[in-house]
Regions:
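Boundary/entry segment of secreted carbohydrate-active catalytic domains
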Residues: 1-40, 44, 167, 171
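Conserved, mostly hydrophobic/aromatic
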Residues: 41, 69, 112, 123, ...
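C-terminal beta-strand-rich structural cap/linker in extracellular carbohydrate-active enzymes
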Residues: 452-474
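Noncatalytic carbohydrate-binding groove/subsite architecture in carbohydrate-active enzymes
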Residues: 141-311, 315, 322
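Conserved beta-strand positions
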Residues: 14-16, 43, 125, 131, ...
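Substrate-binding cleft and catalytic face of glycoside hydrolase catalytic domains
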Residues: 36-56, 60-194
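Carbohydrate-binding surface patches
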Residues: 391-437, 466
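Aromatic/acidic polysaccharide-binding cleft in carbohydrate-active enzymes
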Residues: 272-371, 389-392
Length: 474
């Protein structure tokens, strides 16, 4: 294949969730993404949703997506090969598995892409296939075979669309060289090189590891003699992965639950037993773990929210500076209105990352992270590049220049610090060269930051909370 250029410009996107239209009516979500400043919407579609019986197509969910798109929007559809009748592992949801009949799968993909021709920019074949058992019930060679069929069908139906490799997740990026997860993706990258245009990476864990993660997946491709542009199909934080003490306690309870003998026909699943045990001893848990629980103390909930707001900014800026031009935040909102289950482990791990929530049947409740996302999107509107600037004698200082043609200069600045306690440290004053007439600064929460000028220099306080420094209107 010829070299492939990265998608032009910079776009911030949001994932709707993992089950759009599966457990309820497909409600509007693209206008909500647009209202936050997002210009890319990612959504999941399942084979069984679209083709519930052989040869019978139901376009309810697909048309609901298309009806919400404006010409200026970009759309990314993750197509999961989950079907009660067409896949090796009969399932309406997850894990996805290989098609029983490759030709039938190709026809399904062709019909789907033809229905959306010219409206969907990115088509993705399943999600995090190395997360076997949970998201993909198959092998790496089977994924490559399905990816190859998928890519051929997409390109025949809509030559202008791009194919995205199933996301390379934290299971790969956090594992050591030679791990099963890395071996899985290495096989896919080696043998599936002609079947995708963009490499999707999922950026969880420590935000400051993002440049290394992006370079790691690029190196994975270069080892096999090629390279594709990298996009971030998911990111957000904080997650439990960032707190070793919290993760150790969680793993201890998980191990106890999964190794305890089941008693009786109504024995509770081990994941729910784990959650029940955590709530039973909540008062003695480390605060870095308690803050992920439902109804945790308000001061811990507020601290988690502040960390989330900071990381919405830092994760994006670090990814963009690494040459990623599309970032997609996980996630917009709960899957359905009114669902609460504090023993749901996935909710514990990722539920608080949602930007919005329901008020009755409407997605109208904005969390603090949604405001942080909208604020960042406003600052980055029209941006076409981000680069890190050298900070002499301050290795803990992160300074980034944003290119915004026609909008004036913008820098984003913060200091490294402990993810949980860093906000307790006092800010430090820094100087920046600033040859512009005006100088204004606000932080990731929208609060004004005092700026003083000394000739061509400006001084302002910095901390773990990112600061936006700009010359004109924000």
């Amino acid at each position: 294949m010829d070299p492939i250029a990265a998608p032009a410009g910079i776009r911030l996107g949001i994932v709707r969730g993992i089950s759009y239209g599966m457990f309820g009516k497909p409600d509007p979500f693209v206008p909500q993404i647009r209202a936050l400043g997002g210009s890319l919407a990612r959504v999941y579609v399942y084979w069984g949703q679209v083709e519930p019986e052989p040869g019978r197509y139901d376009w309810t969910v697909v048309d609901a997506i298309l009806d919400q798109l404006d010409p200026a929007d970009e759309a990314w559809v993750t197509v999961c090969s989950s079907s009660p009748w067409a896949t090796r592992n009969p399932s309406a949801f997850l894990p996805s598995s290989p098609a029983r009949d490759t030709a039938r799968y190709a026809r399904f993909v062709s019909h789907l892409v033809t229905r959306c021709r010219g409206r969907v920019d990115y088509w993705q074949c399943n999600n995090e296939p190395s997360n076997t058992g949970l998201l993909w019930d198959g092998t790496a060679p089977e994924y490559v075979e399905q990816l190859t069929t998928f890519a051929r069908a997409v390109r025949d139906a809509d030559p202008g669309a791009r194919i995205v490799l199933g996301g390379c997740g934290y299971d790969v990026l956090s594992s050591p060289p030679g791990s099963e997860e890395r071996a899985f993706f290495d096989h896919v990258v080696e043998h599936g090189r002609d079947a995708f245009d963009l490499f999707s990476v999922h950026l969880y864990g420590d935000p400051h590891d993002i440049p290394g993660h992006v370079e790691s997946v690029r190196a994975m491709m270069r080892r096999h003699g090629y390279e594709r542009p990298v996009v971030a199909g998911e990111y957000n934080g904080p997650t439990l992965f960032e707190f070793p003490e919290a993760q150790a306690v969680f793993q201890q309870e998980m191990t106890a639950a999964f190794t305890s003998p089941a008693t009786g026909a109504q024995a509770e699943p081990p994941d729910r037993s784990t959650m029940r045990a955590l709530y039973a001893r909540e008062a003695e848990l480390p605060d870095s773990l308690r803050m992920f629980l439902e109804d945790c103390p308000p001061e811990l909930a507020a601290r988690r929210d502040r960390i989330n707001c900071r990381q919405v900014v830092t994760r994006n800026v670090l990814a963009l500076a690494a040459g990623v031009t599309r970032t997609v935040c996980w996630n917009l909102a709960p899957e359905i209105p009114g669902y609460r289950d504090r023993l749901n482990m996935m909710g514990f791990l990722f539920g608080k990352l949602a930007l919005l929530d329901y008020d009755g049947p409407e997605l109208t409740v904005r969390h603090a992270s949604a405001d942080a996302f909208a604020r960042l999107a406003g600052h980055l509107d029209g941006a076409d590049g981000v680069r890190r600037l050298a900070a002499v004698d301050r290795p803990d200082l992160y300074v980034f220049a944003v290119s915004r043609p026609g909008r004036g200069p913008l820098e984003v600045v913060w200091t490294a610090g402990d993810v949980f306690t860093g906000e307790d440290e006092p800010p430090t004053q820094i100087e920046r060269p600033w040859p512009h007439m005006e100088a204004h600064a606000v932080d990731a929460f929208g609060a004004a930051v005092p700026v003083t000028r000394d000739g061509a220099l400006v001084r302002f306080p910095v901390s773990v909370t990112p600061v936006f420094l700009f010359a004109g209107p924000a």
